[in-house]
Amino acid sequence: MNVNAAPEIVGRASQGVTPGYMSGFGNSFETEALPGALPVGRNSPQRAAYGLYAEQLSGSPFTAPRGANERSWLYRIRPSVKHSGRFAKADMGLWRSAPCLEHDMPIAQLRWDAPPMPTEEVTFVQGVRTMTTAGDVNTQAGMAAHMYLISRSMVDQHFYNADGELMFVPQQGRLRLVTEFGVIAIEPAEIAVIPRGVKFRVELVDGPARGYLCENYGGAFTLPERGPIGANCLANSRDFLTPVASYEDKDTPTELFVKWGGALWRTSLPHSPIDVVAWHGNYAPYKYDLRTFSPVGAIGFDHPDPSIFTVLTSPSETAGTANIDFVIFPERWMVAENTFRPPWYHMNIMSEFMGLIYGVYDAKPQGFAPGGASLHNMMLPHGPDREAFDHASNGELKPVKLTGTMAFMLETRYPQRVTEYAATADTLQDDYADCWRGLEKRFDPSRP
């Protein structure tokens, strides 16, 4: 398998919405797996159809403004109180939460190679490796950047995260996310977001899988404002897909893992918790194909700020200052005249964690491989390496299309603390800073 190559779009319908999904972002959806399972004109009937229980899942306070109010009504075989037992602490493995100060690593620009696939059997819960944490999970602010390495599907195991919503960014291998709300299938170049409190399990489709995982402790991801761009381009609402209802009526023992307060807890259940027969509301998991992102850019001169590539944003209480921005660098045309076209040299109040899904990143043609990661923390300088600088400074400025590439960035207002796993990993590149060593003094006061 060539992990550097851009994957083809698999399973997309030629017209209309992909079967098994509903189109739109933040819509008030309704879906039922059995006819008549959804009540009409009310949320909590005296007796729900099919002997179901009505239950509300709230992703925001009751009194949140209507535009930010998130909740769904679920009609399920058993209420969630039956999916809860005596919890005991479970081994967190390499999963960490903010604040995490377990390693006193000197400040530096950092980069990692792709981690190798595990040789032992590892499920999703066991396979999360935290790279950085930021903010504080207990104040619902900040994030964690993880890698996941999975070699075995979750069988009779389920999980939900009370600490934050999870964004899956596959890099190698397809995943099947079996959630309470329905089934989501994703592949490299797609993402999936699972809200807080939503139970799910992770299944492999075609062998071991590797990817990135963003844990958002703060406000839910939403679409960024377009401002003067107008009503179109960037990520369009219609390209987000939410699953239709499906359920399991399965009375076999299962384990339920819950991440709560930065710790992992487990309990045993006599049945599957994936038992929602119908639901309606706007608090639900979704997927998005990054290849449908419509980029905008400079069509005259200069290099615009990377914020024009924002797919989703988790806002903070300060307008224009994100808890997290999820930004991608997809295929696009470079046409600016008399311009240094790669990302410029930069020091930033925001902290940037980057990953590469496939292809080559234009500012780092060497050393930044698919499945790898980099960290440029707040106010630490970064920018193109010597090779990228020389090529961009001296090359012919004809229109060039960057093809077969997909990088992303998780940018947060908080400094990102490196975990012990990330600080001591064999994949950490000790010589990363050497990529700028070849940049020479070019100043000559006699030559304007």
Curated annotation (Swiss-Prot):
Query: Its GO CC terms?
Result: cytoplasm
Q: Which GO terms describe its biological process?
A: L-phenylalanine catabolic process; tyrosine catabolic process
Catalysed reaction, written as an equation: homogentisate + O2 = 4-maleylacetoacetate + H(+)
Required co-factors = Fe cation
Q: In the UniProt record, does the keyword Translocase occur?
A: no
Question: EC number(s) for this protein?
Answer: 1.13.11.5
Q: Which Pfam families match?
A: HgmA_C, HgmA_N
> Which residues of this UniProt protein bind Fe cation?
H346, E352, H382
Which biological pathway?
Answer: Amino-acid degradation; L-phenylalanine degradation; acetoacetate and fumarate from L-phenylalanine: step 4/6
Q: Tell me the residue numbers annotated for binding homogentisate.
A: Y361, H382
> Any keyword Coiled coil?
no
Look at the named UniProt entry and state the broad enzyme category this protein falls under: oxidoreductase
GO MF assignments: homogentisate 1,2-dioxygenase activity; iron ion binding
UniProt entry keywords in alphabetical sequence: Dioxygenase, Iron, Metal-binding, Oxidoreductase, Phenylalanine catabolism, Tyrosine catabolism
Q: Where is the active site?
A: H303
Q: Tell me the InterPro entries matching this sequence.
A: HgmA_C, HgmA_N, Homogentis_dOase, Homogentis_dOase_bac, RmlC-like_jellyroll, RmlC_Cupin_sf
**Gene3D superfamilies per record:** Jelly Rolls
Per the record, the domain of life is Bacteria
Q: Which family does it belong to?
A: Belongs to the homogentisate dioxygenase family.
Protein function? Involved in the catabolism of homogentisate (2,5-dihydroxyphenylacetate or 2,5-OH-PhAc), a central intermediate in the degradation of phenylalanine and tyrosine. Catalyzes the oxidative ring cleavage of the aromatic ring of homogentisate to yield maleylacetoacetate.
Q: How does it assemble?
A: Hexamer; dimer of trimers.
The molecule here is called Homogentisate 1,2-dioxygenase
Instruction: Give the originating organism.
Output: Rhodopseudomonas palustris (strain BisB5)
**Gene name of the record:** hmgA
